[in-house]
C-alpha cells in the first residue's frame, strides 16, 4: 500500500492527499479539489491577455490586460501641519513686538486665556486661528508634509514587525 503525504489547502486549510495549483485573484495557490473551482488553471491564465496575430500587427483580445499602476496620492501628503514648536513661535513673535498677552488677544479678538494656552501647548489653534495669528504676527505656524515622511518599507533596526506580535499555536 502506498503512503500518501497529507497536505493542507492554502485556502480552506483542509488536509488532503492531492492539491491543485490554481490562480486565485492573481496569486498562485495550492488548493484542494473543492477550492480549485474558485481559481483558474495556471496553464490557461495569462496576465497579458491572449494575442492574435493578424498580418504584421499583434492585437491583444483578453480583457485581463492590466494598466500600469500609478501611485495613489494621499490627501494628507499635501495638507499643512501645525509646527511642533508653535507655542514658542507665538510667544517669541509677541514678545518681539512688545505686546502683552492681553494686548495681543484684544488685537486678535481672542480670549487672553486661549492665547496663553497656545503658548503653553495646552491647546492647538484651529485653521482659522492659525491664519489670524500668522497674519498679525507675520509668522508661519504650519509646515508641509513632504515625501520625506513617507515609509517605503524595509526593516527598521529598532522597530517591530508583525511577526514580533504573532503567537503561533502548535
Swiss-Prot record:
InterPro entries: aMBF1-like, Cro/C1-type_HTH, Lambda_DNA-bd_dom_sf
Domain of life, source organism: Archaea
MF annotations from Gene Ontology: DNA binding
Keyword DNA-binding among UniProt keywords: yes
Keyword Transcription regulation in annotation: yes
Alphabetized CDD domains for the sequence: HTH_XRE
UniProt keyword annotations, A-Z: DNA-binding, Transcription, Transcription regulation
DNA-binding region, residue range(s): 101-120
All residue ranges annotated as the HTH cro/C1-type domain in the record: 90-144
Membrane spanning residue stretches: none
Protein name: Uncharacterized HTH-type transcriptional regulator MJ0586
Amino acid at each position: 500500500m502506498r503512503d500518501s503525504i497529507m497536505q493542507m489547502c492554502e485556502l480552506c486549510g483542509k488536509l488532503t492527499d492531492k492539491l491543485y495549483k490554481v490562480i486565485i485573484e492573481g496569486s498562485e495557490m495550492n488548493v484542494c479539489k473543492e477550492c480549485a473551482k474558485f481559481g483558474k488553471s495556471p496553464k490557461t491564465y495569462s496576465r497579458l491577455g491572449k494575442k492574435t496575430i493578424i498580418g504584421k500587427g499583434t492585437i491583444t483580445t483578453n480583457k485581463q490586460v492590466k494598466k500600469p499602476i500609478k501611485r495613489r496620492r494621499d490627501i494628507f501628503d499635501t495638507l499643512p501641519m501645525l509646527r511642533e514648536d508653535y507655542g514658542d513661535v507665538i510667544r517669541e513673535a509677541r514678545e518681539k513686538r512688545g505686546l502683552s498677552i492681553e494686548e495681543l488677544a484684544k488685537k486678535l479678538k481672542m480670549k487672553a486665556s486661549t492665547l496663553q494656552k497656545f503658548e503653553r501647548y495646552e491647546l492647538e489653534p484651529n485653521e482659522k486661528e492659525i491664519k489670524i495669528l500668522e497674519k498679525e504676527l507675520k509668522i508661519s505656524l504650519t509646515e508641509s508634509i513632504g515625501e520625506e515622511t513617507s515609509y517605503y518599507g524595509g526593516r527598521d533596526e529598532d522597530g517591530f514587525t508583525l511577526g514580533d506580535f504573532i503567537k503561533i499555536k502548535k
